[in-house]
Amino acid sequence: MARIAGVDLPRDKRVEIGLTYIYGIGLSRSQEIIAATGVNPDTRVKDLSDADVAALRGEVESNYQVEGDLRRLEAMNIKRLVDIGTYRGRRHRMGLPVRGQRTRTNARTRRGRRQTVAGKKKAPGK
């Protein structure tokens, strides 16, 4: 089992795809890492030698911020925006889109499910 940056890579996937299971590594960054270490991208994770795994682990841990460190960095950046009172910080705090998207309609992912608003009650009939 190849374990890199605290993540168990899926055994039956190609190395190129398996590395993307690490938070902060997408396909292009995965390809950069593989090129730097000289590992064949078509190799399955289960077929990697210990030396290959060690090379990949060394490359990832020395040159990239991934997993917990990256999550902590993102949280600190958002907290800084909130603390200094910027517009972006307020939008983060209110749970609304931060980058200027419209909110009259759409923005459901960021705002959450719709909340039902009670309509007017009819007056009792005579």
Swiss-Prot record:
Record keywords, A-Z: Ribonucleoprotein, Ribosomal protein, RNA-binding, rRNA-binding, tRNA-binding
Gene3D superfamilies assigned: 1.10.8.50, 30s ribosomal protein s13, domain 2
Positions with biased composition (Basic residues): 101-126
GO CC term (a single one): small ribosomal subunit
GO biological process, one term: translation
A Pfam family recorded for this sequence: Ribosomal_S13
Superkingdom of source: Bacteria
General function of this protein: Located at the top of the head of the 30S subunit, it contacts several helices of the 16S rRNA. In the 70S ribosome it contacts the 23S rRNA (bridge B1a) and protein L5 of the 50S subunit (bridge B1b), connecting the 2 subunits; these bridges are implicated in subunit movement. Contacts the tRNAs in the A and P-sites.
Subunit description: Part of the 30S ribosomal subunit. Forms a loose heterodimer with protein S19. Forms two bridges to the 50S subunit in the 70S ribosome.
Family: Belongs to the universal ribosomal protein uS13 family.
Region (Disordered): 92-126
Name assigned to this protein: Small ribosomal subunit protein uS13
Coiled coil: none
UniProt GO molecular function: rRNA binding; structural constituent of ribosome; tRNA binding
